[in-house]
């Protein structure tokens, strides 16, 4: 084993690895950048006090290499830190030549990576994540591009209606115990393809997908303006009993840890903005606090809000937690609108003939008995929130209380209308159960559309004048053709 004496006062015997790495901030002094490394590790690699060395640019890329050389133009110094009781002496290397730094470092460099070997130190700039993202977005004719993950397809259509182009979709419906032998893993993905033409469809479990492969696929496409993440909400939702939440934690089926692969997706896609949609309880969870902190560390400005559907002209009482993180400061959530106070009944009457009578069903009786049944009445101004489990006829399903004392079960067409989903949105050849599930677990369309539109405007406001002019000219050139007929 090699040993080394760090200095005369502090003698330390230590194993010397073949390689030692560090990451340090680019130093500044008097308004000028300086590459400075002050470390006990320098003598380990032959850079003792007084040793001379060369400084040369790395060929073909940013960075520089320092090599010990008796005739080198620079030498290693030592510093003494009087305030330190532990290791007050450190050796130091500094490169301050402006011409060399301009050749070796990009203008946006903030941090440097040092790879130390015996007699050699390779210094490379660490990629400035947010600077690179901002630069790529500002150069686009239209930055409204989306990667939509964990979606049944409704929010895909919503992004399209808000002016976004859909570059990529990651959607995989996990098999549930009730599915038995019926494979439903492609149902949401098929619905997405009925409503968008993405460049890439990833029909893989977010917990198992190869993120390096996702990174490679993302690099083949355009920069992503918005990454949308509708994390599974079951284990945060008040609709799921606490006993079942605890059971899912014990048996490993809980979805509370989905925030981790979602962060990995942000890391490989490098979007300009990130949107999360979930139930309000998610915003108070430890998982969200972790998510928020890491995005902040990565250079995103993170904002969140609880949005309520009635305040955005929608017909249900759906309340949702939203987070929008952006590499561009200044995003603002859409302001609330006046809440409607007129009865909902007149708007839904045309759907009632197709809603089946369930007056004598056990689920209704049980729901009424325990107070969990959620009713639309002739005086209701809004519908209760539609749930993923609606079609199963659970105790907490939404029922319609008719004026004659009977009860009806909402048709899928009515559920679609209540959630504000356009009536021309196709669901393909899905079963009614899957169609209801997609509708119930989706979004309050008008509210979500207003947020997508706000994100789109936020992205377009960052464009450089030249790209804005190109986009405007392109629109003007296309207008005559629109009226050719």
Short names for language-model regions:
Residues 1-37, 43-45, 202, 221, ...:
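Hydrophobic, helix-prone linear segments
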Residues 2-21, 26, 31-33, 41, ...:
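C-terminal target-recognition/interaction regions appended to catalytic cores
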Residues 43, 160, 296, 437:
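Short polybasic/polar patches that bind polyanions
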Residues 135-265, 270, 280-284:
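Core alpha/beta nucleotide-donor-binding catalytic domains of modification enzymes
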Residues 215-221, 236-393, 404-406, 477, ...:
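Class I S-adenosyl-L-methionine
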